Regions:
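C-terminal and inter-domain tail/linker signature
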Residues: 1-135
Length: 135
């Protein structure tokens, strides 16, 4: 029973660390658009599955520089964050002028660094066929 509790405690601690790491990383990279500060959280190889960026830390750096120029007012609100082992999922509200997007980002962490990223984005319409929020 103690070994099971120890394992559960270790997993919970890992999930907490991973969620904190992704929250710091994402805020620096996307909200503050500070790649130099966000770089410390990226592994030596960063595999990008999003069509918006290239592989490698340099790919993320190029995207952040592009965002500074093309979407300078973009801000992401973290709605929920879920961790499962080496994976962290974020459900976000991406605010930009004009429009808002519902975003799901998935990150894989290895040795305390972000090494892989996927995303899915959807415009938030003015009206919907139901009264349910996308968030």
């Amino acid at each position: 029973m103690t070994a099971t509790k120890d394992l559960q405690g270790a997993r919970a601690a890992q999930a907490k660390r991973n969620k904190e790491l992704i929250t710091r990383y994402y805020d620096l990279a996307l909200n503050q658009k500070d790649f130099a500060a966000a770089r410390q959280y990226i592994g030596p190889y960063y595999r990008q599955h999003s069509t918006y960026g290239a592989d490698g830390p340099e790919g993320l750096g190029a995207f952040v520089e592009w965002a500074k120029v093309n979407i300078p007012n973009m801000h992401v609100d973290f709605v929920r964050i879920i961790a499962d082992g080496d994976y962290v999922l974020m459900h976000n509200r991406g605010k930009n002028s004009p429009g808002t997007k519902a975003v799901v980002d998935i990150f894989r962490i290895e040795n305390g660094k972000v090494v892989e990223h996927w995303d899915v984005l959807q415009d938030v319409p003015e009206t919907a066929k139901n009264a349910n929020s996308m968030f």
